[in-house]
């Protein structure tokens, strides 16, 4: 859940930075799980031209965030590289915490030998350098914070930086709406804000594995549950009307509704005598 919250906060901040007018309602747990899965497949090395399909990733993000394809490919690659580093650091912290707690629980059998002054100086220098790097990282993280996050942290001390960024990104930078969302989530009960895995309200927390599976099936699996209850009644074929026959002067005519008819004048016998029959006469042969 911690890794998914890091991905969601970074993705929302990235989209709001490069697409201020984009609709963030399409960013849900499904796309966050997809991005987290892509980063886990890439490993700690991060994206490269060999193991990362930029076109497929851009096409997938374009379906959820219209306009994502207009962001330069280099900017997207830098964001994925940076996010991969953040996830690797978070995994290292999670792995170090159980080990440190186990070491603290053990009772030392023999006293540690005294350290030399040279080793003490080297450790002091390394600790000072590590503290300087941590301070630089904190300064860079503060520079990347969305405007208004510090106000939310002052009003809600129990709210973390990732939660404040999440809510502010969902509210599209509107501070009043973000405060209202946090208040409505906090009214559900103080138990919703206790524990490391329950920092966000119920409606802002990501679902569990079973809930995510049922959510994906419900949203993308097309199953008509009422199909067995339907009765198929096909339309009866239209029968062609019977052809009507009309007669005019004892002659069969069409049914198009003719209004006029050729009227031939009777010919005289003298005129008929002038006609020539071009058809030759039949020859009758008797065998």
Curated annotation (Swiss-Prot):
Its subcellular locations are: Cytoplasm; Nucleus
Keyword list, A-Z: Cytoplasm, Nucleus, Phosphoprotein, Ubl conjugation pathway
Which residue windows are coiled coil? none
Entry's Gene Ontology molecular function annotations: ubiquitin binding
Q: Entry's InterPro entries?
A: CUE (IPR003892), CUE_CUED2 (IPR039805)
Residues covered by the CUE domain: 144-187
Keyword Kinase listed: no
Q: Which GO terms describe its biological process?
A: negative regulation of cytokine production involved in inflammatory response; negative regulation of macrophage cytokine production
- According to the record, the residues making up region (Disordered) are 92-141
Membership in a protein family: Belongs to the CUEDC2 family.
What disease is linked with this protein in Swiss-Prot or TrEMBL?
May predict the clinical outcome of tamoxifen therapy of breast cancer patients. Patients with tumors that highly express CUEDC2 do not respond to tamoxifen treatment as effectively as those with tumors with low expression.
Give the domain section of the comments: The CUE domain mediates interaction with PGR and ESR1.
Quote the protein name from its UniProt record.
Answer: CUE domain-containing protein 2
Lineage of producing organism: Eukaryota, Metazoa, Chordata, Craniata, Vertebrata
């Amino acid at each position: 859940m911690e890794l998914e919250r890091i991905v969601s906060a970074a993705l929302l901040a990235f989209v709001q930075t490069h697409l201020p007018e984009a609709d963030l309602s399409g960013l849900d747990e499904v796309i966050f799980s997809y991005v987290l899965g892509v980063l886990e497949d890439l490993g700690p090395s991060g994206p490269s031209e060999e193991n990362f399909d930029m076109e497929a990733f851009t096409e997938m993000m374009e379906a959820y965030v219209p306009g994502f394809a207009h962001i330069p490919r280099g900017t997207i690659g830098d964001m994925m590289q940076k996010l991969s580093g953040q996830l690797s650091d978070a995994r290292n912290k999670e792995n170090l915490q159980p080990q440190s707690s186990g070491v603290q629980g053990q009772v030392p059998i023999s006293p540690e030998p005294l350290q030399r002054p040279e080793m003490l100086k080297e450790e002091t220098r390394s600790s000072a350098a590590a503290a300087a790097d941590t301070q630089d990282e904190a300064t860079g993280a503060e520079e990347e914070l969305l405007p208004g996050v510090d106000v939310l942290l002052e009003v809600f001390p129990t709210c973390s930086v990732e939660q404040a960024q999440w809510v502010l990104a969902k509210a599209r930078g509107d501070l009043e709406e973000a405060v209202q969302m946090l208040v409505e989530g906090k009214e559900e009960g103080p138990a919703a804000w206790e524990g490391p895995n329950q920092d966000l309200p119920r409606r802002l927390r990501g679902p569990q594995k079973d809930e995510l599976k049922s959510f994906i099936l419900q949203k993308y699996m097309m199953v008509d549950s009422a199909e067995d209850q339907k009765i198929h009644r096909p339309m009866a074929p239209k029968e062609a009307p019977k052809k009507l026959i009309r007669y005019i002067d004892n002659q069969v005519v069409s049914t198009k509704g003719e209004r006029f008819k050729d009227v031939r004048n009777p010919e005289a016998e003298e005129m008929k005598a002038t006609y020539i029959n071009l058809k030759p006469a039949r020859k009758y042969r008797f065998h």
